[in-house]
Amino acid sequence: MSIVQKQEEMNGCGLNVDKVEAFTVSPQEKGRKNKRKLADPSQPNASSLTEFPPYELPSLKPQNHLSGNGSVGEVSNQLQVEVSESVEWDDPFACHLEELLSSNLLTLFLDTMKQLIDLGYTDDEVLKAVSRCRLYCGGNNLLSNIVNNTLSALKTGDEGAGSGDYVFEDLQQLVSYTLVEMISLIKEVRPSLSTVEAMWRLLMCDLNVLQAFEAEGDGLVSSSKLSDSESLGAESNPPKSSDPDNPKPPQSDPQSNRNEPLKFGNFPNTPNSKKTQSSGTTPGKEVCSGSTVSCQGMRSTSFTLVSDEKLVSCRKGRTKKEIAMLRQKSCVEKIRTYSKGSGYKAAKFASVGSFLLEKRVKSSSEFVPRNSSSKITAEIGVKVSLAEDSGCFVRKNSKLDSPVVVVDAKGYITALPARSVKSASKKKTGSESVTLIPSASEKKSDSSIPSTSEKKSGSESEEKASVSAKLAPDYYAGIPYDAALGIYVPRDKKDELILKLVPRVNDLQNELQVWTDWANQKVKEATGRLLKDQPELKALRKEREEAEQYKKEKQLLEENTRKRLSEMDFALKNATSQLEKAFNTAHRLELEQSILKKEMEAAKIKAVESAESFREAKERGERSLKDIHSWEGQKIMLQEELKGQREKVTVLQKEVTKAKNRQNQIEAALKQERTAKGKLSAQASLIRKETKELEALGKVEEERIKGKAETDVKYYIDNIKRLEREISELKLKSDYSRIIALKKGSSESKATKRESLGMPKVKRERECVMCLSEEMSVIFLPCAHQVLCFKCNQLHEKEGMMDCPSCRGTIHRRIQARFARSG
């Protein structure tokens, strides 16, 4: 029935969202976050999801309480919280931490399954039992707690499966849901923490939820603050037991529950848990007892208050974000329903004594100042008083809106905000006003600079405010605007508060961004350091587990020894009783002696037979003696052979000594040769070194000579070329003069000869350049000039001239050209 009712509550929450948006929400209700989660008192098996309200910024606290739309404001505020939580889950550092935690949880469950499979269970049985059982949060070794819980579930079988056990579809769903539940649990006990901070605490504490509540990341107060808190805490100590209205809080022994693992939302059962009831109440009233602790010698108090009944709709087919959103929607619907007048039902509280201290009671010498950047959680100042009219214990004279723990006679505990306590007590008493005593750290935080925890809680409230601003960006909607004056005219105190707070939105958003960047950087650095130190931490934990295992084995051995001693005593008693029985038996044996005599006669007959067998054995012995004599002859032969072998051994030993002497001589000679070789090698190295130096000098000299020779060769080549050019010019000049002389003589003779013979006169453009009478017929290659006749070409070639007379180019080939003469 509880599953169906919770599903209907969530569906009802989704249907009433449109109605909630139609109402005007007061700024006081907007300032509140993480409202207390309530449970239906008509459901006996359902437990509440108790949550402490975070600390608000002083500047954002409204002065007047508008109670007209209280329940509607709470629902709207929870919708804003849903969006804020989805934003926190989308943070990249949150995703990185989520991957690390998921991998650690998955490894933890796989190790559990491996151990259980080694015990003889099948894979299906182990997977079903692990996915059905909830994670234990007590003790130091989380793996052993899960193994013990799963073993108990496997032993009980289907009979042990209650209504609170649900089977997941696969192991990954179990890991995802377990991670979300652990983070939600930490945020319920520590409401000032964000999702990233809760993940970081789980990672630092190796998935131990109890250690995450009291993580060292909170920082420790300094010695001066400790002395102030002790002096202030002394004022809030409970009065003496003689006061009938203020009985002593219940005393519990934390050692009695140390070895007992705890489930989510459960406390160990102690006999002192019933001492919180008051004897002066009527049967019609439920008497509430306040369970609190003074501030002497301790820094803070943690309550592990969780819901034992999980949201079933989140069990299957949901991601972590959907689980968190559905969880918030369920809480919104509960607040909307129970604000109309239904009662409160708190989480089951069996014994809160051992968890009030949470191992935080330490001597003042152990408190060391921590880094100022660590977040300091607000201490809970305590004082126990009995409100006779209301029938419950509450803390009085509190200046801040710190949570109040109320415990009724049935053992249920509820964490109420200060305002809820005031309003509830006013309704019951009619005139008596209940106030709360602030703790030492709260008084100091009012008069000093705001601590890091206040900044952190302020940054969270600013983040929530920024998310709500994205949902409703028009802050002035519904406020009348005066066009003449150019200002908004507030109609009530709510509008005045809106007009005052809207200008601060940008500043708060900038401050939120700065804090977010700083926190992300610190998370990244701390994650890197944790990943570096994680192997060493695991090794230390393993050593601690081995030491604990050794102690357990030693204790088991002592128990076994005691058992053996008791068994030996028991055996000794049995031996004495058996001795008495033996005396009684002796008489009976005398009666049986006669029977034995008869048997002895039969034995004599057997002795005769044995004598015969002895004779046969004697004959075999004689034969053996004969064999021994023959073996003695063989022994003598073997001894002679052994003597000869020994002589050979002595000869060989002499040869060995000679060989050793020769070896020593050879070794001495070898040693001398080695020394000589060392000297020669040293001389050779010196010679090599000298040769290398000489070679280097020779190379340098050779390079110098080569350079000088190259410069001389270049100089001589240039002179040769210059002289060759001069020689060629002189040859050309001599050839030219010779040719001119030849021209003069031959031209006249040829001209006269042509005239006498009647030959045609050669054209001027076809005349030879040397004789000026014959036709050009020789072609020079490669310049292709045709300037000489055949005879002049022969003369030109005989004189050794290789330059063309026209272009002065080198002649490689001479070709005689023949032309057809026209008739």
Curated annotation (Swiss-Prot):
Pfam families: PIR2-like_helical, zf-C3HC4_3. One of its GO terms (biological process) is protein ubiquitination. A zinc finger (RING-type) spans 768-808. Residues 453-464 have a biased composition (Basic and acidic residues). Residues 61-72, 267-282 have a biased composition (Polar residues). InterPro entries: PIR2-like, PIR2-like_helical, Znf_RING, Znf_RING/FYVE/PHD. CDD domains: RING-HC_MIP1-like. Keywords: Coiled coil, Metal-binding, Transferase, Ubl conjugation pathway, Zinc, Zinc-finger. Residues 224-240 have a biased composition (Low complexity). It catalyses: S-ubiquitinyl-[E2 ubiquitin-conjugating enzyme]-L-cysteine + [acceptor protein]-L-lysine = [E2 ubiquitin-conjugating enzyme]-L-cysteine + N(6)-ubiquitinyl-[acceptor protein]-L-lysine. Residues 536-738 form a coiled coil. PANTHER family: E3 UBIQUITIN-PROTEIN LIGASE RF298-RELATED, OS05G0141500 PROTEIN. Belongs to the RING-type zinc finger family. The RING-type zinc finger domain mediates binding to an E2 ubiquitin-conjugating enzyme. This is Putative E3 ubiquitin-protein ligase RF4. It comes from Arabidopsis thaliana (Mouse-ear cress).
